[in-house]
């Protein structure tokens, strides 16, 4: 007998590839997040999203240290808590892991 998963990935989005002058990390995040939101028919991001775990390392080249709340706001998910996770090349995977742990812990 298989147990039901406690956390599931229900949608994904991706920003356009290539060199994009003047486009900041918050815009790339919003582009991917909005695509993912559009794929979930009954999702209301402002109501249904309880927290955002965002993996990125753009602080050193964008000179912006509180990226997660800004990116979440650009994607339309305020006032949910937004946490930036930084772990070099594993930032996104670690953010996903933190989100799964939050769900499994009852957040």
Each language-model region and where it sits:
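Conserved "HGTGT" condensation-loop signature of ketosynthase/thiolase-family condensing enzymes
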Residues: 1-80
């Amino acid at each position: 007998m298989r147990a039901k998963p406690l956390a599931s990935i229900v949608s994904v989005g991706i920003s356009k590839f290539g060199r994009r002058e003047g486009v900041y990390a918050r815009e790339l995040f919003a582009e991917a997040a909005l695509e993912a939101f559009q794929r979930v028919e009954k999702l209301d991001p402002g109501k249904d999203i309880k927290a955002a775990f965002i993996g990125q390392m753009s602080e050193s080249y964008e000179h912006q240290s509180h990226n997660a709340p800004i990116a979440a706001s650009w994607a339309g998910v305020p006032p949910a808590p937004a946490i930036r996770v930084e772990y070099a090349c594993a930032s996104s995977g670690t953010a996903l892991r933190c989100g799964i742990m939050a769900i499994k812990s009852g957040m």
